Amino acid sequence: MSVLRSAVTAAAGLALSLPSPALAGGGVSISSYGQRALLIQGGGQSVLLNPYKAVGCAAGMPEPRLTAGVVLANSELADEGASDIAGGRFLAQPGSYRIGGLSLEGFASPHDRMGGRRFGNATIWRWQQGGLSFAHLGATAGELTAADRVLLGNPDVLIIGVGGGSKIYNAEEAAAVVNQLNPKRVIPVQYVNGDAPEGCDQEGVQPFLDAMGGTAVRRLGRSQTLPGLSLIHI
């Protein structure tokens, strides 16, 4: 597995082009707007993940005021899933949804390491877009159950929080989930660049890269076309 590290900060945004090996003319482009806010475009659809208000660990960041066909959030906390920031069909609750040709499945997962007793449940997501399968675990610290692993499968693209703290996987936990799901591509999210804002309990991405152990690190530019290999995109 290769590790690709971007010189572009999360606030500046990272744009990726992911071709689909399974669908001629398929694939998606992914743009980062910091924290775990990603805009995924492809297959005639657009999906925005986790728009946030500039509070908590997102303090000082530009809010992603965008419009997409579907807006997915792991929770409705202001710094994770602010429904009034972005335009589009907003989904944050578990369930099966079909919107504009997209089939999306949301599953409840503990937001914390106490079975949800402290912060309740988050929603983890899976869907197909542009010939690629996605799993979005951007805001959970709960251990995956055997049923979760079956439902999520082996996604082409895994989006996972890695910055630690009370509601996000830490580096070792995130690396364990990557090994469990064995995705083709990994996009780590929800980590800080530079000094953490006051009161933010998250760290940077380097501990996650270290936890992945012995993988090569390559720096990306602002945009990149990527082959269908096992990669980590930052």
Label every model-predicted segment.
Residues 26-41:
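Short N-terminal segments immediately surrounding and downstream of signal-peptide cleavage
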Residues 171-175, 196-208:
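Histidine/acidic-residue-rich catalytic or RNA/ligand-binding cores of hydrolases
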Residues 20-24:
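Sec/Tat signal peptide C-region and signal peptidase I cleavage site
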Residues 232-234:
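Conserved small/polar residues in nucleotide/adenosyl-binding loops
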